[in-house]
Amino acid sequence: MSLLFMISVGFSLSSLSMMVIQPLSLGLMLMLMVLCVSGLTSLIIFSWYGYLLFLVYVGGMLVMFMYVISLIPNLIFLSNKVFAYFFFIFFGFMMMNFFVMKELVSVEVKSMSLFDYGYMSMGGSGIIMLYDNFFCYVLLAVILLFVLISVVKICYYCEGPLRVFKFK
């Protein structure tokens, strides 16, 4: 049922993103869609893959929308019409999923085999979390720290690519 809910939210957000025109609103819609897609990925494939996908998307979106937002003035963020449209589309997808899946899911068919290790989100990839792979995690942390220091050095207050904000 949570998979149907996530799919409904994803389709609702993707249809809602066509109505929004301001960069802040588009950034919010894109972040919510990324959260939905990474949640779906972690439910279907592996939880660590969804988490990694979320981090990559968020990192790219933060840099891109910082440039866009610094150049465009802030306008009206979201209107009530957009929220009404979102809830209408969301409930439409939820009802459609409910009526389509009602015949496929029955209470008698549920068994305890769903709680086996093979059906969990990690699926058999628990070997990634072993002590032997600790060096890979340390190397990844050092690389991410180096990238963080590089980005901070590039975007220093007076030397960065962003425009300088002068407060009065």
From Swiss-Prot:
Catalytic activity: a ubiquinone + NADH + 5 H(+)(in) = a ubiquinol + NAD(+) + 4 H(+)(out)
EC top class named in words: translocase
E.C. number(s) listed in UniProt: 7.1.1.2
Keyword vocabulary terms for this entry: Electron transport, Membrane, Mitochondrion, NAD, Respiratory chain, Translocase, Transmembrane, Transmembrane helix, Transport, Ubiquinone
Subcellular location: Mitochondrion membrane
Single GO cellular component term: mitochondrial membrane
Transmembrane segments: 26-46, 52-72, 82-102, 111-131, 134-154
GO molecular function: NADH dehydrogenase (ubiquinone) activity
Membrane-topology annotation of the record: Multi-pass membrane protein
Family classification: Belongs to the complex I subunit 6 family.
Function: Core subunit of the mitochondrial membrane respiratory chain NADH dehydrogenase (Complex I) that is believed to belong to the minimal assembly required for catalysis. Complex I functions in the transfer of electrons from NADH to the respiratory chain. The immediate electron acceptor for the enzyme is believed to be ubiquinone.
Name by which UniProt lists this protein: NADH-ubiquinone oxidoreductase chain 6
Name of the gene this protein is made from: ND6
